[in-house]
UniProtKB/Swiss-Prot annotation:
The keyword Cytoplasm applies. Its cofactor is pyridoxal 5'-phosphate. GO terms for cellular component: cytoplasm. It is an enzyme of class 5 (isomerase). Coiled coil: none annotated. It is found in: Cytoplasm. This is Glutamate-1-semialdehyde 2,1-aminomutase. One of its GO terms (biological process) is protoporphyrinogen IX biosynthetic process. Homodimer. Pathway: Porphyrin-containing compound metabolism; protoporphyrin-IX biosynthesis; 5-aminolevulinate from L-glutamyl-tRNA(Glu): step 2/2. It catalyses: (S)-4-amino-5-oxopentanoate = 5-aminolevulinate. Its EC number is 5.4.3.8. Pfam families: Aminotran_3.
């Protein structure tokens, strides 16, 4: 029995399902989840000391790679001053200033402790600001596990096959309108009928929780237009894309300015951090300035702030994202060529330091329906073949992959060669 198998058996006695987040349980691929002991650069090491090239990156935060010295040094220095005060600190201001500098649509920002908390708070703020109840989201997009947003959600909810989580009251879910991602005409119809009742649209500008789906031409522009016409708030959930697909996030990459933005993952460098912010006139409705309540004991935690600030300073260096994107392109083009040579139907996509792949005959995967048509059995087999080769992709077909600064050309070349061997086994 491997150390991971032993730990998983032990974990299931005290932790529901043996994990603290469902996608970690390997339900999407089968088998025993791997328990990791440490990470360094582009690599993670399991409890049996086996090394893997890591393309999960803690689901996105590790844009510099694991255990980056700048981040660790910043955290060590802060530890000498204390862990938490529940009071204002200067580093919170510095962090807020940096975020607003990098994301110009954010006049003000509020720090929280997770992406879920950020999206939940942004929704509440939009409702309070507009005086409306209804919200629009898109099928297959995941915005955390708050009740309003678990209707037809992506990510782990897709893996579990639970489109609407038990425990979400029907009278609450009725205020959530779910439309098809990338369906421009459906958006227009919805807003022509009830636009004056809608508080906000929340959207992943790149849908990273049903793998990696890019917006079709005109989709994000349409969202901006209908919100302008109806008075609804446009929220970009950039928990995943923020600082990753471009320094200014997906909004900078696509040139669309939202009213509110939610952030997480990269902003915390692996620490539990989220944030939401946007137009001053909207943000001034948040307590203590306004009546919309939001609070958190550990919000703006100084250890998390210094870690996040270290990452933001590093990724602000000239050429960082160009290099990141080049690495991702090299990886997915190599995977695609390997699949084609093996005769395996395969579709790839990448944007900035984020990528996805699908086992499908389709040349483009653009909707939730497209994702559902992909060959999950081939993905599961490929995942385990690659794991045996020492390459760790996301253990679910509905999750995006991530490149870090630490990945080398040699890492990528090895991954492609391992994929060639793995594809050969699928034929």
């Amino acid at each position: 029995m491997s150390r991971s198998e032993d730990l998983y058996a032990r974990a299931q006695h005290r932790i529901p399902g043996g994990v603290n987040s469902p996608v970690r349980a390997f339900n999407g691929v089968g088998g025993t989840p791997i328990f990791f002991q440490r990470g360094e650069g582009a690599y993670v090491y399991d409890e049996d000391k086996k090394r893997y090239i890591d393309y999960v990156g803690s689901w996105g935060p590790m844009i510099l790679g694991h255990s980056h010295p700048d981040v660790l040094d910043a955290v060590r220095q802060q530890l000498d001053f204390g862990l938490s005060f529940g009071a204002p600190t200067e580093v919170e201001i510095t962090m807020a200033e940096k975020v607003c500098e990098l994301v110009p649509s954010m006049d003000m920002v509020r720090m929280v402790n997770s992406g879920t908390e950020a999206t939940m708070s942004a929704i509440r703020l939009a409702r309070g600001y507009t005086g409306r109840d209804k919200i629009v989201k898109f099928e297959g997009c995941y915005h955390g596990h708050s009740d309003s947003l678990l209707v037809k959600a992506g990510s782990g909810a897709l893996t579990l096959g639970v489109p609407n989580s038990p425990g979400v009251p029907a009278d609450l879910a009725q205020h959530t309108i779910t439309l098809q991602y990338n369906d421009i005409e459906e958006v227009k119809r919805c807003f022509s009928e009830i636009g004056d009742q809608i508080a906000c649209i929340i959207v992943e500008p790149v849908a990273g929780n049903m793998n990696c789906i890019l917006p079709v031409e005109g989709f994000l522009e349409t969202l901006r237009k209908v919100c302008d016409e109806s008075g609804a708030v446009l929220i970009f959930d950039e928990v995943m894309t923020g600082f990753r697909v471009a320094l200014g996030g997906a909004q900078a990459h696509f040139g669309i300015v939202p009213d509110l933005t939610t952030l997480g993952k990269v902003i915390g460098a692996g620490m539990p951090v989220g944030a939401f912010g946007g137009k001053r006139e909207i943000m001034e409705h948040i307590s203590p300035l306004g009546p919309v309540y939001q609070a958190g004991t550990l919000s703006g935690n100084p250890v998390a702030m210094v870690a996040g600030l270290a990452v933001l300073n590093k990724i602000s260096e000239e050429g960082f994202h160009q290099t990141l994107g080049t690495k991702a392109d090299r990886l997915v083009s190599g995977l695609k060529q390997a699949a084609d040579e093996a005769g395996v139907p395969f579709c790839v996509v990448s944007v900035g330091g984020m990528f996805g792949f699908f086992f499908t005959e389709a040349e483009v995967v653009a909707t939730f329906a497209d994702v559902q048509k992909c060959d999950l059995s081939k993905f599961k087999a490929f995942f385990h073949y690659m794991l045996e080769e020492g390459v760790y992709f996301a253990p679910a077909a509905f999750e995006a992959g991530f490149i870090s600064q630490a990945h080398t050309e040699e890492d990528i070349d090895y991954t492609i060669e391992a994929a060639k061997r793995s594809f050969a086994k699928l034929v």
